[in-house]
Amino acid sequence: MRWSLTRPGEEPGTPRDATMTETVKRNLVMGRLQDFVSWGQKNSIWPFNFGLSCCYVEMATAFTSKYDIARFGSEVLRATPREADLIVISGTVFVKMAPIVKYLYDQMLEPRWVISMGSCANSGGMYDIYSVVQGVDSFLPVDVYVPGCPPRPDALLEGLMLLQDSVGTQRRPLSWMVGPQGVERVTPPSLRDAKRDQRRAAQTLRSPDTI
């Protein structure tokens, strides 16, 4: 930070003018209102404290000091869906539980997002039976899929960053009086496809008994 002082009645000189111009350039931010709203939303996603099964343990681990999810502005866990805008479906979704999950989702604030965490939430996992929903996307609009059984907390954080990138590029009306009443959602890229070349080039794999 730079600053300068002038005496009362003193004429500002050229060096001070240059300093003020430089200061204005560093501190004045110009842009569209929608861009600022999207920036604020993507950096202040409030997750709903909700879990279903084993993957919830890994989700809770992501909020510990080791992983420090506060870096992404998502450390504010909400105990009620009316104050949250993100729900992480972490675990097995049974048919009897699906209406309750949908009811909780309907109470969330707009705009709201869904992360499907784990194989059971993504596709039913190993439970190919009548009592388990074969994919939470059959009744909820899923924004990000996090694979694994269960996924590591690092994978959830990577999914959160992927969600933030898509939220930052979404366009939504700021008022019912302005523009169409739809939300232009951006399809998140597939990280499996993005990392394919890097994985193919790997020649040394870590030992399975290490972390």
Swiss-Prot record:
- Note describing how the cofactor binds: Binds 1 [4Fe-4S] cluster.
Entry keyword set? 4Fe-4S, Cell inner membrane, Cell membrane, Iron, Iron-sulfur, Membrane, Metal-binding, NAD, Quinone, Translocase, Transport, Ubiquinone
GO CC annotation terms, alphabetical: plasma membrane; respiratory chain complex I
Q: How does it sit in the membrane?
A: Peripheral membrane protein
The UniProt entry, under SUPFAM superfamilies, shows:
HydA/Nqo6-like
Region annotation (Disordered) ranges: 187-211
Which InterPro entries did the record assign?
A: NADH_UbQ_OxRdtase-like_20kDa, NADH_UQ_OxRdtase_20Kd_su
Gene Ontology MF terms: 4 iron, 4 sulfur cluster binding; iron ion binding; NADH dehydrogenase (ubiquinone) activity; NADH:ubiquinone reductase (non-electrogenic) activity; quinone binding
Q: Name one GO biological process term.
A: aerobic respiration
Q: Which coarse location class applies to the principal site listed for this UniProt protein?
A: membrane
Q: Where in the cell is it found?
A: Cell inner membrane
Superkingdom assignment:
Bacteria
Entry's Pfam families?
A: Oxidored_q6
The UniProt catalytic activity note for this protein reads:
a quinone + NADH + 5 H(+)(in) = a quinol + NAD(+) + 4 H(+)(out)
Q: Which Gene3D superfamilies match?
A: 3.40.50.12280
The entry marks the following residues as binding [4Fe-4S] cluster, namely: C54, C55, C120, C149
In short, the EC number is: 7.1.1.-
Would the keyword Zinc turn up in this protein's UniProt record?
no
Keyword flag S-adenosyl-L-methionine: no
Q: Which family does it belong to?
A: Belongs to the complex I 20 kDa subunit family.
Q: What does this protein do?
A: NDH-1 shuttles electrons from NADH, via FMN and iron-sulfur (Fe-S) centers, to quinones in the respiratory chain. The immediate electron acceptor for the enzyme in this species is believed to be ubiquinone. Couples the redox reaction to proton translocation (for every two electrons transferred, four hydrogen ions are translocated across the cytoplasmic membrane), and thus conserves the redox energy in a proton gradient.
NCBIfam families for the chain: nuoB_fam (TIGR01957), PRK06411.1 (NF005012)
How it assembles, according to the record, is: NDH-1 is composed of 14 different subunits. Subunits NuoB, C, D, E, F, and G constitute the peripheral sector of the complex.
Name of protein: NADH-quinone oxidoreductase subunit B 1
Q: Which organism is it from?
A: Gluconacetobacter diazotrophicus (strain ATCC 49037 / DSM 5601 / CCUG 37298 / CIP 103539 / LMG 7603 / PAl5)
